[in-house]
Amino acid sequence: MYKILFIDEEKDTLQDFEEFVEKFHSKIKLEPITNFPLSNLEEMIECIIKIAPDAIISDYRLNELKTDIKYNVPYNGVDLVEEYQRIRNDFPCFVLTALDDEAVNSSNDVNIVYVKNILYNQEEGNAKAKFLDRVISQIEHYENRIERYKQELA
């Protein structure tokens, strides 16, 4: 079972993600873990380390709506995943957004940015590689790299 951490400032979107994962059918079970962004990037990174997910999926604009959180979030989803990848290089991270052009422009890796509408099956259509299939694949590739590195060091 893989633990997938989803970070968003909207409670409804966190619930939508849980439902999205529940509807996903695969031989590999996924455990969705949802979290609001914290008001400090360093604290958020510490929180992620404690959760120990197998992948991180974050909304891009974490400070856009203030209905469910009452504090300022001074970073976006790209900032968050890039900061985490400084600690764990090549860790499976993804950013979901309605503003994919903006997120792509601010990201060092355009391949981590996906349109948020996939949570509502509006964008995946007949794609053979669905979003969560890609997440699982990235986790497996990451784990295989770690294992190869361990064998090289042994």
Where are these regions (language model features)?
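Short, flexible/disordered intra-domain loops and linkers
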Residues: 62-76
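Conserved acidic segment of CheY-like receiver
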Residues: 2-25
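A short, hydrophobic beta-strand element within the central beta-sheet of small alpha/beta folds
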Residues: 79-86, 90-103
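Acidic, metal-coordinating helix/loop segments flanking the phosphotransfer/catalytic sites
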Residues: 33-58, 63
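Catalytic phosphate/metal-binding cores of nucleic-acid and nucleotide-processing enzymes, i.e., regions
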Residues: 20-24, 62, 100
